[in-house]
From Swiss-Prot:
Species the sequence originates in: Nitrosomonas europaea (strain ATCC 19718 / CIP 103999 / KCTC 2705 / NBRC 14298)
Pathway in which this enzyme or protein is active: Purine metabolism; IMP biosynthesis via de novo pathway; 5-amino-1-(5-phospho-D-ribosyl)imidazole from N(2)-formyl-N(1)-(5-phospho-D-ribosyl)glycinamide: step 2/2
Keyword ATP-binding tagged: yes
UniProt GO BP: 'de novo' IMP biosynthetic process; adenine biosynthetic process
Protein name as it appears in the record: Phosphoribosylformylglycinamidine cyclo-ligase
Molecular function in Gene Ontology: ATP binding; phosphoribosylamine-glycine ligase activity; phosphoribosylformylglycinamidine cyclo-ligase activity
């Protein structure tokens, strides 16, 4: 018995592809990205990409391993990537946002999974994005062991996509960094960012809309767009080196909320951070944004990293050695403040 088909009087067969989902394109993407994923593999990764689940053995060197997880996206920085067709590095941003977060608790990133969603899959663009994700995983020393590509017709405008990532790391139970040991007179170090990283882009895009900006608009020796789309710096290798050499009391990844809101997240009761903004060089990009957007100083400090992508709190006797270790690992670092006693009615941070 043949079912009637009043909605399709010509009786042309319909398919998943004609409905907007191309399974073959998804399979081609998987084959394209396998070589990139293989370059990220660690010996603890069991199996490869393409299975229903990804397997990873906890490294045997840990006595009391504690798993640390983090998930994040790239936010509206993606909109600039679409507008200027810069897809090759946005995946680095995706990895950085999660691995830097779990690093704050002392964790070594182990593996990463990604989620790529679009209305219509463009294999070339998706390949560029995942290649960037793999690059970020290599920088972080973690394995890209799986992910999901979701082609969902009608969900996203043509040429646009969304990204999310998920990282898992491990730390010895007795070496978890939670800020509880921070005391008066400890030193606050700031490690340079590579730009806005992946935060504040809704404000950035508003500022761009209010000004005449072209793809070749200059900002010193680079273009404004290049400066804005510089990928988020990954601090994993340099900070793991530091943590192996010295006891780090606290770390803060300067993301949404800027310096004003992220540093207090790692401070125990009874202390506050006093930061001297004259101690580091604020990149000219932030000057441009503040000037062209008429953005108040406090708003800048609570939205952008203002040139500091990661904060380290360390005992005074270890501060100079920490600066040298980070410098030798390729970081630009400044002593930007100190920990002071806090009265109950005072703010947990002052940026002078």
């Amino acid at each position: 018995m043949t079912a009637s088909n009043p909605a399709n009087p010509d009786k042309n067969p319909i398919s998943y592809r004609s409905s907007g989902v191309d399974i073959d394109a998804g399979n081609r993407l998987v084959e394209r990205i396998k070589p990139f994923a293989r370059r990220t593999m660690r010996p603890e990764a069991l199996g490869g990409i393409g299975g229903f689940g990804a397997l990873f053995e906890v490294p045997g060197k840990y006595r009391q391993p504690v798993l640390v997880s983090g998930t994040d996206g790239v936010g509206t920085k993606l909109k600039l990537a679409f507008q200027y067709a810069r897809h090759a590095t946005i995946g680095i941003d995706l990895v950085a946002m999660s691995v830097n977060d779990i690093l704050v608790q002392g964790a070594e990133p182990l593996f990463f999974l990604d989620y790529f969603a679009c209305g219509k899959l463009d294999v070339e663009i998706a390949t560029q994005v995942v290649q960037g994700i793999a690059h970020g995983c290599e920088d972080a020393g973690c394995a890209l062991i799986g992910g999901e590509t979701a082609e969902m017709p009608g969900m996203y405008p043509e040429g646009e996509y969304d990204l999310a990532g998920f990282a898992v790391g491990v730390v010895e139970k007795d070496r978890i960094i939670d800020g509880s040991g921070i005391r008066e007179n400890d030193i606050v170090l700031g490690i340079a960012s590579s730009g806005p990283h992946s935060n504040g882009f809704s404000l950035i895009r508003k500022i761009l809309d209010l000004n005449t900006v072209q793809s070749d608009t200059r900002l010193g020796e680079t273009s404004l767009i290049d400066a804005l789309l510089t990928p988020t710096r990954i601090y994993v290798k340099s900070l793991l080196t530091l943590m192996a050499e010295l006891p780090v009391k606290g770390l803060a990844h300067i993301t949404g909320g800027g310096l004003l809101e992220n540093i207090p997240r790692v401070l125990p009761d009874g202390v506050m951070a006093h930061i001297d903004s004259s101690t580091w060089v604020r990149p000219s990009l932030f000057d441009w944004l503040q000037q062209h957007g008429n953005v108040a100083r406090e708003e800048m400090l609570r939205v952008f990293n203002c040139g500091i992508g990661m904060v380290v709190v360390i005992a005074p006797e270890h501060a100079q050695t920490a600066i040298e270790i980070l410098h030798n690992a390729g970081e630009t670092v400044w002593q930007i403040g100190e920990i002071r006693p806090r009265q109950s009615e005072t703010l947990p941070i002052v940026i002078a």
